[in-house]
């Protein structure tokens, strides 16, 4: 089993290139099912989850070719024959559920195993299914599978009880061929949703977002294959911002969408991190003394839950008391016991974590319990005195492209060993 070994205390310097967003790439790959033609997704991040969803498409008959050097993924869904993707692949990743919308839209039916992914809460699929049912889909759940069929999809007004990203994406994709007009109210507003809409519209869909944030989809007859480059990964960018701040370093981050990272920038500036935006780049100066902050994770445009663990690592080293309240997932503090191994002072109170900054962290052996927890442990290891070993790093590989190589280029001492 691979692990990371980090020797802390190094100052970072130089530039790092951000990859395209995994959370954009996965629904876009799923959406290629809709057109039944050849699509090319450019600059795909070579991540475990990307390989899983590409294998998932292969399991239903799609042809997928990946250029490992350029990251270009060529997908031909013209010969998809099965409506039941490989169950073992589905169980590897929760994002597998993103093929429900495209499958019901193009084929009128699907059978899919209940999915896997990070164990950070129940993350129910009821909102996905509620949206599909509103469009006229019949759904049965039993023996670990979800089976669905629809003789005809009809547009409807759908109100989401919570602005779920996955549910919003599935309903959008399920609606592109539905007769009439579908309106999704209280839809998720994440930049990755906008990217999916842009991709679908370039294929020939008729989707728009109005001032209220509602998404309107007017059904079309067909879509065409296209070439497309997804947006940059705002969560990876945020992780490297913290890498600079936690090591008291100055670095340049290339591949930043200013609008998408504004919610994070607000908190980073409140802490005292200096940031200068230069086009698609961000210059980070983390050499100031930082101040504690209180954070509440919220749907976009609030502070992202996917950055909660990473900023906790930074607050562990920031003098004073900070409070993080997690409102999205009910089980997303699994990194706390691992951070305590470094000497962090954290107490959990319900959905809140109270962090009292300590003067220094000490290297230790820790385990990545999920994707973002793994990133948080790497960040702690960068500043900890001595050597840190992090196991179960396959979680990290689900969301970060060669993070150890990018950090090494900046001057960190981190290596992957078996």
Swiss-Prot record:
EC class of the enzyme, as a word: transferase
Main location (coarse class): cytoplasm
UniProt xrefs under InterPro entries: Enolpyruvate_Tfrase_dom, Enolpyruvate_Tfrase_sf, MurA_subfamily, RNA3'P_cycl/enolpyr_Trfase_a/b, UDP_GlcNAc_COvinyl_MurA
GO biological process: cell division; cell wall organization; peptidoglycan biosynthetic process; regulation of cell shape; UDP-N-acetylgalactosamine biosynthetic process
Gene3D superfamilies according to UniProt: Enolpyruvate transferase domain
UniProt pathway annotation: Cell wall biogenesis; peptidoglycan biosynthesis
Classification via Pfam families: EPSP_synthase
Active site residues per record: 118 (proton donor)
Annotated EC: 2.5.1.7
Chemical reaction(s) catalysed: phosphoenolpyruvate + UDP-N-acetyl-alpha-D-glucosamine = UDP-N-acetyl-3-O-(1-carboxyvinyl)-alpha-D-glucosamine + phosphate
Residues carrying 2-(S-cysteinyl)pyruvic acid O-phosphothioketal: 118
Positions annotated to bind phosphoenolpyruvate: 22-23
Binding-site residues, UDP-N-acetyl-alpha-D-glucosamine: 94, 123-127, 306, 328
SUPFAM superfamilies (alphabetical): EPT/RTPC-like (SSF55205)
Localization terms from the record: Cytoplasm
PANTHER family in the record: UDP-N-ACETYLGLUCOSAMINE 1-CARBOXYVINYLTRANSFERASE
HAMAP family (UniProt xref): MurA
Family the UniProt entry places it in: Belongs to the EPSP synthase family. MurA subfamily.
General function of this protein: Cell wall formation. Adds enolpyruvyl to UDP-N-acetylglucosamine.
Name of protein: UDP-N-acetylglucosamine 1-carboxyvinyltransferase 1
Record organism: Clostridium acetobutylicum (strain ATCC 824 / DSM 792 / JCM 1419 / IAM 19013 / LMG 5710 / NBRC 13948 / NRRL B-527 / VKM B-1787 / 2291 / W)
High-level lineage: Bacteria, Bacillati, Bacillota, Clostridia, Eubacteriales
